[in-house]
Design a protein with these regions (language model features):
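PLP-dependent aminotransferase class I/II
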Residues: 1-174
Length: 174
């Protein structure tokens, strides 16, 4: 259980006044990314399907098809994020982006049913195929309220160029 002490509560009390502004800025950042990346057919962008839904955009997650995915793969290689051990499009793109100074993150690389604590629970992998596939395909781009439009353009332009290069390197046909 986590409890706030007096100091943490005081800091939160000040920060909470800025929350609406931060979320508003994140929405602008997300809309910029959506506009900058919408023409790239290799990227699946996040979508909001309802006007009644409000997204906080804590993360901006793109999805890249994993052409190496095979349900028969062992967990140890399937969810590996090191490009030297699993040369997937997502992992290679992450490496190449970092070489350009662009930090991208794989937040949830291993689904719960594949984690050691659940090893003996006998989950049916066939019933969780979408979960497994998504865990091997998602990548989060830099997302924070203060990111400038110019920085986003840099991220998007490099992502588009690097992604084409990765597709050629991996000899992926659309």
């Amino acid at each position: 259980n986590s409890r706030l002490d007096t100091l943490q509560a005081a800091v939160l009390n000040i920060k909470i006044k800025s929350l609406s502004k931060w979320i508003s800025n994140r929405k602008k950042v997300a809309n910029n990314y959506l506009d900058l990346l919408e023409k790239n057919s290799f990227i699946h962008l996040p979508k909001i399907d309802s006007e009644n839904v409000s997204h906080s955009w804590n993360q901006f997650v793109i999805k890249l098809k994993n052409y190496n995915y095979d349900i028969n793969n062992d967990y140890s290689e399937l969810f590996e994020t090191d490009v030297n051990k699993n040369n997937s499009l997502r992992n290679l793109l992450k490496l190449r982006l970092s070489e350009k100074g662009i930090n991208s993150i794989i937040y949830y690389p291993i689904p719960i049913h594949a984690q050691i604590a659940y090893k003996n629970k006998n989950f049916s992998r066939e019933k969780l195929i979408n979960t497994e596939r998504v865990c091997t395909e998602v990548l989060s781009l830099p997302m924070y309220p203060e990111i400038s439009y110019e920085e986003q353009v840099y991220v998007a332009e490099n992502l588009n160029i690097i992604l084409k290069s990765c597709i050629n390197e991996l000899q992926i046909c659309a």
